[in-house]
């Protein structure tokens, strides 16, 4: 299956997302923040990034934009995973280059459906 990098500052959320993705036979690499995220992405070469929006320091919207503006990482699809579920946040995520948006709390099937849509 695919290698997926999950970025979330909440250890509990990382565990939930990892469990869902590993249960679907994906390889999962976790990262707790957006500091040095580009280096992590370049080193890991994931097929997909699941990125939380609400994080200290650089938020997920900013990190998404930075990854999509970097020639080394711009082609890696990103799913924003956040508690912000209103339409303006979804629109803003798309403007930053996100390929999909999953709202917390979510069911495992919702995340896996987004992964399948994005990866094909």
PLM ranges: what are they?
Residues 15-23:
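Charged docking surfaces used in two-component/phosphorelay signaling
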Residues 25-32, 40:
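Short hydrophobic/Thr-rich beta-strand motif most characteristic of the beta2 strand and flanking loop
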Residues 44-50:
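Active-site beta3 strand of CheY-like receiver
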Residues 56-57, 74, 86, 105:
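The feature encodes the CheY-like receiver
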Residues 106-115:
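C-terminal output helix
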